[in-house]
Design a protein with these regions (language model features):
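Outer membrane beta-barrel
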Residues: 44-185, 196-198, 205-214, 281-284, ...
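Outer-membrane beta-barrel pore domains
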Residues: 45, 54-61, 90, 97-98, ...
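Bacterial N-terminal signal peptides that target proteins for export
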Residues: 19-28
Length: 356
């Protein structure tokens, strides 16, 4: 009886606090149940969920800045002995977003093992045109340098393709591998193509010795007049061919990566124009955790180029990488850049990248 009276005598504020406490308990119970369910599902399907992030400080244009890099959510799952899934979602800065950040679906890949090392892949992939794009995802902790080479920033190669293809690896003594992919072309959206043309990617590689890979690739696409490519409207129909070659060696002491892409863009108005984008990276492990490195980039465009933004550029990067462990890396580097449009630029960047 006394308990009932005390409840009646509670103030409105006290009632609200009591309800909020109970609501909090209910929410915590629901979250706990969801986590237990998710853990059970992950165990059944052998699912792995990982994250990657980097923070950096940069001295550029006579000022010091601090910034956040991309936050990468990386999910892999083995559904059974033949089907597997890979998903990669990135949260990154976007000046047009109300929150200054946006979500980008970078990869959704469903893989079916046909037989042995032959696989059928469907979804959104990293276009396998060179070693860097085929090997590294958006987790900066694995990059040998702070950022990608300039040919990526200049959008020389299409980073992603949505479609279907075949993939195989590690055949014979040379450990031969191949990729053949047909997908939506440049300018297509995430749910449909913008024209009737399809892009074709064909790539082969060998691994003659441990830690070495030599590759060659070819890409062909027709970009329709009026296509929106990264915010740029293409005013001509462009027939594009890209041929890339790469050499990669990451040994116990020496690291070497050299890649080059030769682009041919042809229109009925301007004819055929050539572009050559290349870079060379080298590193040497002086101790177990310290790797000094360099990278030289070069972008060379033919006069009259109308698809790529013509900006002949040379850049030199020198830096030091300290590997705290497999999932924590500190990098410090200096970059000198001389470009046709922006002149000379010098900057120093420090980065701390982790995986978790």
């Amino acid at each position: 009886m006394l308990f009932r009276v005390s409840l009646l005598e509670l103030s409105l504020t006290e009632w609200f606090r009591l309800l909020m406490k109970r609501k909090t308990i209910y929410i915590l119970l629901i979250v706990a149940c969801l986590l237990i369910s998710l853990q059970s599902i992950c165990q059944i399907t052998n699912t792995s969920i990982k994250g990657f992030i980097d923070v950096r400080s940069m001295y550029d244009n006579n000022k010091v800045s601090f910034g956040l890099g991309e936050q990468d959510l990386f999910i892999t799952s083995e559904l059974n002995d033949r089907f597997s899934f890979l998903g990669e979602t990135v949260f990154k800065f976007d000046s047009s977003s109300f929150t200054d950040f946006s979500v980008s679906i970078e990869r959704i890949v469903i893989k079916y093992n046909i037989q042995g090392n032959h696989n059928l892949i469907i979804g959104k992939i990293h276009t396998p045109l060179n070693y860097w794009n085929d090997t590294y995802h958006h987790g900066r902790v694995f990059f040998p340098t702070i950022d990608r080479p300039l040919l990526f920033q200049a959008e020389i190669i299409p980073l992603h393709t949505i479609g279907a293809g075949l993939q195989g690896h590690d055949f014979g003594k040379l450990r031969f591998g191949y990729d053949f992919f047909v997908g939506n072309g440049i300018g297509a959206g995430p749910v449909s193509d913008n024209d009737k043309y399809k892009s074709v990617t064909a790539a082969v590689h060998i691994k003659p010795v441990d830690n070495m890979r030599i590759g060659l690739s070819y890409y062909n696409d027709v970009i329709s007049k009026g296509a929106d490519v990264e915010g740029k409207i293409i005013n001509w129909k462009v027939n594009q061919q890209l041929t890339s070659g790469s050499f990669a060696y990451f040994g116990k002491k020496v690291e070497l990566l050299a890649e080059s892409t030769f682009g041919i863009n042809r229109t009925d108005t301007t004819g055929t124009k050539h572009t050559l984008a290349s870079y060379v990276y080298g590193g040497y492990k002086i101790k177990d955790k310290f790797i000094p490195y360099f990278r030289v980039d070069n972008l060379a465009y033919q006069n009259g180029e109308i698809y790529f933004t013509k900006n002949n550029t040379t850049a030199i990067v020198v830096g030091m990488r300290y590997e705290i462990n497999f999932l924590a890396v500190v990098k410090l580097e200096y970059q000198y850049t001389h470009s046709e449009l922006n002149g000379i630029n010098n900057k120093v960047t420090a980065q701390f990248a982790i995986g978790f």
